[in-house]
Amino acid sequence: MYNYTHQKYIKTMVKVCLYLKNKIRTSYNMKITISKFQVLFFVLFTLSACTSDDEKDISAECSPIEKGTKIMPLGASRVQGFPGLFESYRYELWKDLIDGGFEFDFVGNNEDLWEYASYKNYCFDNEHEGRGGWTAAQINDNIESWLTAVGDVDIVLFSSPGGNDALDGADLEDIIANVNSIVDKIQAHNSNITIIIEQLAPGKTSFMTEEYTLLFTQMKTVVTQIASSKKTATSEVVVVDMATGFTDGMLADDIHYNQAGAAFIAERYYNTLVPFLD
């Protein structure tokens, strides 16, 4: 997509390896352990695949959109994604919005460490606010500084609220308090903002214990109540149902999306977003 040199490519791979070794944590507090050997193997394997044809592919000319409605994808690993292991909905939603003819700009302080293919001569907009393994409590502690750093935000896509908290064993009351506080802080940043908040898609059937299933069901009701109570004359808070119709076949592992899951979530977001886009 961009005119990468070998030096920039190697730098990117080093960042990815550090991310894998030190930071990556799948959603719901499940850690991935990577040895030094695995990291080294990953670097060598990736660099060995870097042929001149590959360079041509990633340096294909494309242009950013970066204008129009500013949309912040907010959440944890389901927002961040990690291609090759599991997918984010963002790339599929980005393509859907291009197909719809909308002008928009994904915003956030995080940028992907990997490349996505260009689409219709546009470069993928890789900015987001997805942080793997983070809880609503952690997001609540940081959302104000993130919003300040980004500046203008018109729409927030609030993914899987309370999901990681639940798997960390947090009390429902604490989850509710943190999600409410996040919404309050977003609206304080922009009193005219639109917030689209998920009724989260479930994990794999074999993974959903009785305790998780109960909390999952409770959170569906909680999200509806929060949206209703936080809506103002100038700020819409809209629920999007990601649970109905979501199946085990849409998961790459116990809780993360595969390609089909990412496309499903993107379509739900797209249909909810359209009335709020210029």
Where are these regions (language model features)?
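Active-site segments of SGNH/GDSL-like serine hydrolases
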Residues: 159-164, 183-218, 241-243
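Conserved SGNH/GDSL esterase-like catalytic core that processes O-acyl groups on lipids
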Residues: 78-177, 212, 217
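Substrate-gating cap/lid alpha-helix
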Residues: 202-241, 259-263
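Active-site-proximal beta-strand/loop segments in catalytic clefts of secreted hydrolases
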Residues: 74-78, 107-112, 158-163, 198-203, ...
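Bacterial Sec-dependent N-terminal signal peptides
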Residues: 46-69
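Loop/turn elements at helix/coil->beta-strand transitions in domains of secreted/extracellular proteins
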Residues: 67-70, 100-105, 151-157, 190-196, ...
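Bacterial N-terminal signal peptides
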Residues: 38-48
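Histidine-centered active-site loop/cap adjacent to the catalytic His
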Residues: 74, 252-278
